[in-house]
């Protein structure tokens, strides 16, 4: 569905008021999504102007010939209006085919105490990132970074790519095997739930032995129903030599695809884990997902581009703020007397022998 008042977006507004938006029906609230074209992946088909004779016939057939010279009608005919731009973006032949095939999913969610199926649709950064991944793989780039700001749906992006890359590799007569790698138990549970709610079969791996066993299995799925599958791996308890596997069975028809969640955080460039992950299957596709900028001190020792390759796609904070998904940070001057009070409190805490880390942990910061 498209909703438009034919006005330009007012960036940074949490509740969309002005602009042209797309959405899918929902059990309760309908979420309006912005759409902005990506210069690297432009829409392929453009609308053609019709001749005046055809225009008159259409207006006459709909008993609307009277509006032909009205200012509103003349404005609405222009191809660069917000409404016509989004219609061209979403409903051009190839783009619509892609959306219908890959961009819509039913998600099982609990609403007001009852299980219901919500219909979700890709946000535009997810759509272009999905196209970017296939384009980069086509160009021979088997590893790269998706930098999407926090809260932009990186787990959902991985789900969409299970669908898209399955068909992509099917054309090459290759069967992909998908892994989503996290570094905490709670993230394993959360990601597994999100994938399962979208209809994927989920296998969980919590130990290095299970991971090694999984890598040695010939075949892409573990279920006997043929349902698309993803293996969610928690590396929190893995040792540095977790997957130094020399005799891994190699199936020429299997393509392993690793999605590394929060890639800025979990993979020590000085350790062996990442090297072993790559060495376990040198032909594997590695897609690093992150949305957190590195501190300058950390970035000096930790060049994510060196570890994971170039950026496949980027969706930064400024765009997320403009789209209303991220609130803008507002810096305010702290009053002088409040600074003094805080200093006194910190001095008292220091005198009591409590460190700052303990305070942060206790407050859940």
Predicted regions and their residues:
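Structural recognition of the conserved hydrophobic beta-strand(s) that form the central parallel beta-sheet
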Residues: 2-4, 231-234, 285-290
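Residues immediately C-terminal
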Residues: 187, 237, 264-268, 294-295
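Conserved helicase motor
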Residues: 185, 205-217, 235-240
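Interdomain helical connector at the RecA1-RecA2 junction of SF1/SF2 helicase-like NTPases
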Residues: 76, 299-365
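Conserved motor-coupling elements within RecA-like helicase/translocase cores
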Residues: 210-231, 249
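SF2 helicase catalytic motif II
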Residues: 249-285
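ATP-dependent helicase/translocase motor core
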Residues: 1-177, 186, 190-201, 236, ...
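Short basic/glycine-enriched coil/helix segment immediately N-terminal to the Walker B
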Residues: 138-142, 170-171, 223-227, 242-257, ...
């Amino acid at each position: 569905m498209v909703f438009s008042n034919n006005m330009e977006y007012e960036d940074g507004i949490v509740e969309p008021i002005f602009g042209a938006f797309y959405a899918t029906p929902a059990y309760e609230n309908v979420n309006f999504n912005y759409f902005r074209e990506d210069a690297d992946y432009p829409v392929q088909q453009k609308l053609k102007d019709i001749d005046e004779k055809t225009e008159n016939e259409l207006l006459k057939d709909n008993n609307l010939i009277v509006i032909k010279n009205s200012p509103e009608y003349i404005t609405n005919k222009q191809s660069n209006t917000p409404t016509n731009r989004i219609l061209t973006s979403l409903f051009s032949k190839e783009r619509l085919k892609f959306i219908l095939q890959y961009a819509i999913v039913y998600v099982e969610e609990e609403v007001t105490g009852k299980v219901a199926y919500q219909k979700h649709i890709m946000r535009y950064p997810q759509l272009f990132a999905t196209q970017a991944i296939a384009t980069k793989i086509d160009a021979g780039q088997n590893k790269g970074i998706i930098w999407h700001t926090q809260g932009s749906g990186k787990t959902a992006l991985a789900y969409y790519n299970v669908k898209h890359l399955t068909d992509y590799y099917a054309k090459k007569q290759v069967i992909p095997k998908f892994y989503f790698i996290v570094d905490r138990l709670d993230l394993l549970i959360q990601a597994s739930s999100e994938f399962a709610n979208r209809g994927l079969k989920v296998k969980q791996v919590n130990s290095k032995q299970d991971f090694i066993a999984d890598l040695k299995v010939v075949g892409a799925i573990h279920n006997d129903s043929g349902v698309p599958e993803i293996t969610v791996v928690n590396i929190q308890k893995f040792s540095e030599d977790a997957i130094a596997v020399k005799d891994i069975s190699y199936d020429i028809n299997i393509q392993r695809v690793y999605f590394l969640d929060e890639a800025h955080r979990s993979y020590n460039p000085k350790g062996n884990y990442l090297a072993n992950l790559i060495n376990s299957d040198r032909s594997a596709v590695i897609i690093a997902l992150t949305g957190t900028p590195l501190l300058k001190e950390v970035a000096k020792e930790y060049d994510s581009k060196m570890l994971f390759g170039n950026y496949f796609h980027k969706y930064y904070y400024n765009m997320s703020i403009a789209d209303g998904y991220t609130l803008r940070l507002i810096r305010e001057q702290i009053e002088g007397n409040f600074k003094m009070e805080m200093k006194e409190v910190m001095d008292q805490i220091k005198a009591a022998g409590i460190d700052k880390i303990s305070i942060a942990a206790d407050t859940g910061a």
